[in-house]
């Protein structure tokens, strides 16, 4: 794994792998267990200070390497996903509301429906031909007698447009 990294690893991971697998040159020991390089105290101090400065520079590069790794889900992406889920739920609620209102409008009182504006005729389509049927007067009397609405005289405008004015009694 030395010197190579896959797309998923950052420089920090690579650094940790290298530090474990390859010892630093100052750690080499001879067969007796002593450092193979003998140094004077001054050279040791200078070398130690120099190594410390390099480590600080390496530390900074390790931080930038680690932060420049592959991008996980960003905050913007997660917010977009949440918004999309919220919009889908809102659309479902709106559809349910519209369906409910539509169903309620279908359940309105049939005695006040536009069919009874023209009680003497009903056009029915059979095989592409319109057939006119008349209702018996008793049918209209029955529905009006048991309705909660009362029909009043229509104005000339209402007669032309086919509007029905109704009054509710309680």
Curated annotation (Swiss-Prot):
Location in or out of the cell: Cytoplasm; Nucleus
Main location: cytoplasm
Keywords, sorted A to Z: Cytokinin biosynthesis, Cytokinin signaling pathway, Cytoplasm, Nucleus
GO BP, sorted A to Z: cytokinin biosynthetic process; cytokinin metabolic process; cytokinin-activated signaling pathway
Disulfide-bond pairs as recorded: none
Coiled-coil residue spans: none
Biased composition (Basic and acidic residues): 35-44
Chain location of the short sequence motif SOFL-A per the record: 10-15
Keyword Transmembrane helix attached: no
Expression across tissues: Expressed in seedlings, roots, flowers and siliques. Barely detectable in leaves.
Domain notes: Domains SOFL-A and SOFL-B are required for function in cytokinin-mediated development.
Its biological purpose: Involved in cytokinin-mediated development.
Name used for this protein in its record: Protein SOB FIVE-LIKE 5
Species assigned in the record: Arabidopsis thaliana (Mouse-ear cress)
